[in-house]
A protein has these predicted regions:
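Membrane-interfacial amphipathic helices and adjacent loop/beta segments
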Residues: 1-4
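Active-site-adjacent pocket-lining segments in enzyme domains
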Residues: 6-57, 61-167
């Protein structure tokens, strides 16, 4: 189930899937990325994307999974996560993080959760679909870096660190 309550019906389990069977892999938004982040089956599956022509798209906190799989080592990206995560997870490269609603680079599309329209448009266009610029009324506001930078308050950060210890 996605963070917005969408249910996703898989057609294969990861053990039976190869990333090469797909033109595109989309990672939906997740409120709590920790279970997926520490699921080696997911990370191993994602690692298969490296050096392929498979489009990979991740929104909200899901780019964390791409980072752990090493797919963002030399790629600019964005994500809807708290900046303290950059200090906690060594696989997130601060120099590659961009404060933008959507970032596309090297067949990887990442977005902050509220930019779901732009995310959908970018995925469709990358797959060769003819999509009008006003498809689903994309965001027209320019956001400042400050508006796109998220921090936990001290108590929420401590709660996250405590939860992280369980992994």
């Amino acid at each position: 189930e996605s963070e917005d309550g969408f249910f996703i019906m898989p057609t294969k389990i990861l053990n039976d899937a190869s990333v090469l069977d797909y033109k595109c892999v989309i990672l939906p938004g997740i409120i709590n990325p920790l279970p997926a982040l520490y699921d080696e089956k997911i990370i191993t599956f994602l690692k298969q994307v490296k050096n392929t022509n498979v489009l990979i798209a991740a929104i909200s906190a899901a780019p964390l999974l791409l980072a752990k799989a090493g797919l963002l080592d030399d790629v600019k990206f964005t994500a809807g996560f708290f900046m303290q995560m950059i200090d906690v997870f060594p696989f997130i490269h601060r120099e590659n993080f961009v404060h933008q609603p959507l970032v596309e680079e090297k067949r990887i599309i990442t977005a902050i959760g509220f930019a779901f329209r732009e995310f959908a448009m970018a995925v469709l266009k990358s797959l060769g679909y003819d999509v009008e610029d006003k498809f689903m009324w994309p965001i027209e506001k320019a956001y400042s870096e400050k508006e796109l930078t998220f921090y936990w308050n001290d108590s929420d950060y401590q709660e996250f660190l405590k939860e992280l210890e369980e992994y």
